[in-house]
């Protein structure tokens, strides 16, 4: 007989331990993401009426009389072994555990002789935060054995109207203004008026708003945005122009449109070429020495940089028959053939020079190369 009673007590304690499981166990944490497993575990954790056999007066009072905290809130239905909806099984287990834990405290108060009304009021005040519906989510971090953790209400309430987050969301949605959508005709009229007048007075703004069926605030904001857009576009164009000017390099055109070629030394003296005049004069002097002292076309003064105005050298006249020797100065300025006894003298044909003077050009005959000190001459054979 004692063995039967001990077996019944152990079975009842096992059933109570299964029904009083907390959501902080390893199985609940691992199966939190799987609703099917959680549903099966909640079904398994429900106590069967055969297993819950009270073995003492305290357990008999628990099974017969509903707890005081659940009597007014309608939570006594959770202790009955009838079918519960799947959506409400998980919160019912939490509330069942919480109600059973507080019921033990109530029996402790009865044994010590304290009043049950204060405990019932305390439980009603504690459970009022969770609402009367079972489908409301609960924050079990606040439902521990320590009563000080349950002083503040849970973050989620049963009804959306009572939630502070819903009030904040409605406030944010109320503050957010919808963006006005203008039609093509309204935009065209606004652009036309902006091209005529960038700033509108109060009467002009109200008149235009009435004609376009807009508010004065919309017209004012549109003009402000349009002025800002125009200013930003002008700044971007100015920056692009500065970047283009910094990358621009002066380049001389060497080939004209008609196909003729022009060079820096052939340009007019007053033409704006962007180069240093001293460099141009040095370049002209080198070209003149390369051409044998001949004056370059379109150049009135051969070396205005090296000589003053009254000492500009003139082209050397053609040599005569009596000249048999060449001075060092004439040899350095222009090449003149040196006559050699017994050699055939080449024929010379006079030709006009650009400045109106006569110059001689060698043609026909054969010239002989003669080596002298510090003098080199070129021999041309036709």
Swiss-Prot record:
Residue segments, region Disordered: 27-66, 144-178, 314-382
Biased composition (Low complexity): 158-170, 321-335
InterPro entries given in the database record: HD, HD_metazoa, Homeobox_CS, Homeobox_NK-like, Homeodomain-like_sf
Biased composition (Acidic residues): 373-382
Coarse class of the protein's main subcellular location: nucleus
Database matches in Pfam families: Homeodomain
A cellular component annotation (GO) from this entry: nucleus
Keyword Nucleus: yes
Tissue expression pattern: Is expressed in a segmented pattern in visceral muscle and in a subset of cardiac muscles. Loss of activity results in segmental gaps in midgut visceral muscle.
Biological process terms in GO annotation: cell differentiation; mesoderm development; mesodermal cell fate commitment; positive regulation of transcription by RNA polymerase II; regulation of transcription by RNA polymerase II; visceral muscle development
Keyword NAD: no
GO MF annotations in UniProt: DNA binding; DNA-binding transcription factor activity, RNA polymerase II-specific; RNA polymerase II cis-regulatory region sequence-specific DNA binding; sequence-specific DNA binding
Biased composition (Basic and acidic residues): 48-62
Function: Involved in the determination of cell fates in the dorsal mesoderm.
Protein name, entry field: Homeobox protein bagpipe
Source species: Drosophila melanogaster
């Amino acid at each position: 007989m004692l063995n039967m009673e001990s077996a019944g007590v152990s079975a009842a304690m096992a059933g109570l331990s299964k029904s009083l499981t907390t959501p902080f166990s390893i199985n609940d944490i691992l199966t939190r993401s799987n609703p099917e497993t959680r549903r099966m575990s909640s079904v398994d954790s429900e106590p069967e009426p055969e297993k819950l056999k009270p073995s003492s007066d305290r357990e008999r009072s628990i099974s017969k009389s509903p707890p005081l905290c659940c009597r007014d809130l309608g939570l006594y239905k959770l202790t009955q072994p009838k079918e519960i909806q799947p959506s409400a099984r998980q919160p019912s287990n939490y509330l069942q555990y919480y109600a059973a834990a507080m019921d033990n405290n109530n029996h402790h108060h009865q044994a010590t002789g304290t009043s049950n009304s204060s405990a019932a009021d305390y439980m009603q005040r504690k459970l009022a935060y969770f609402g009367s519906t079972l489908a409301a989510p609960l924050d079990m971090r606040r439902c521990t054995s320590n009563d000080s953790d349950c002083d503040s209400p849970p973050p989620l309430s049963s009804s959306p109207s009572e939630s502070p987050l819903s009030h904040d969301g409605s406030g944010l949605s109320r503050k957010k203004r919808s963006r006005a959508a203008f039609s093509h005709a309204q935009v065209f009229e606004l652009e036309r008026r902006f091209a005529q007048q960038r700033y509108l007075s109060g009467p002009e703004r109200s008149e235009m708003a009435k004609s376009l069926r807009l508010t004065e605030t919309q017209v004012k904001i549109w003009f402000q945005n349009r002025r800002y857009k125009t200013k930003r576009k002008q700044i971007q164009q100015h920056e692009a122009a500065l970047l283009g000017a910094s990358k621009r390099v002066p380049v001389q055109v060497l080939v004209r449109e008609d196909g003729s070629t022009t060079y820096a030394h052939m340009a007019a003296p007053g033409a704006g070429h962007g180069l240093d005049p001293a460099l141009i004069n040095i370049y002209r002097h080198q070209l003149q020495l390369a051409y044998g002292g001949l004056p370059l076309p379109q150049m009135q003064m051969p070396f205005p940089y090296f000589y003053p105005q009254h000492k500009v050298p003139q082209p050397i006249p053609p040599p005569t028959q009596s000249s048999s020797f060449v001075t060092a100065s004439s040899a350095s300025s222009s090449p003149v053939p040196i006559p050699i006894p017994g050699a055939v003298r080449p024929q010379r044909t006079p030709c006009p020079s650009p400045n109106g003077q006569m110059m001689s050009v060698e043609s026909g005959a054969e010239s002989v190369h003669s080596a002298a000190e510090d003098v080199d001459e070129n021999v041309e054979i036709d």
